[in-house]
Amino acid sequence: DGGYLDDAIVKLTPDGEILYEKSVSQIFIDNGLEHLLFAYGSFFDPDPIHINDIQPVNFDGEYWKKGDVFLSLAGQSMVILFRPSTEEILWKRQKNIFYQHDINIINEEEISIFNNNKRLFYQKKDYIDGHNEVLIYNFKTQQVSSYLQKSLEREDVRTPGQGRGKILSNGDLFVEETDYAR
């Protein structure tokens, strides 16, 4: 009722001691993206961020460093790569992802994103445009591809909320279609 949900990221020790804490709204403000928090015209969204997934980076590479984090922000239909040590958003993607969830690091230059393809219409009615998909973003080529799209289409995978997609080491795709319990 008139409130504002401000998600945050927190790094804890195994004993629960807080090592780092930062409001995602403040991350946006510090990186010149404040306009995205209030870009709804006359409609007030009390949850403009809504973190769906945080994927920590556990190794150094050309495009990220150990300690960086990928954030899946459903309220923005955005994925960002954030570096807590400098408080800088290194990369962001909003194109052709809708209320996405799970992010996984595949290798030194690729991530996967579970794209729900959910459209949210007036009065918050959900609609899935086709089916869910697992997208692969390649940082080297800056290209996006859809992984096993025909299989997801054939199986009619279309969870509007939640969901996971993990590419296994043998190339198989493990999918959790949460809202339909499969």
Question: Where in the sequence are the language-model features?
Answer:
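Histidine-/acidic-rich catalytic cores in large beta-rich domains
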Residues: 1-182
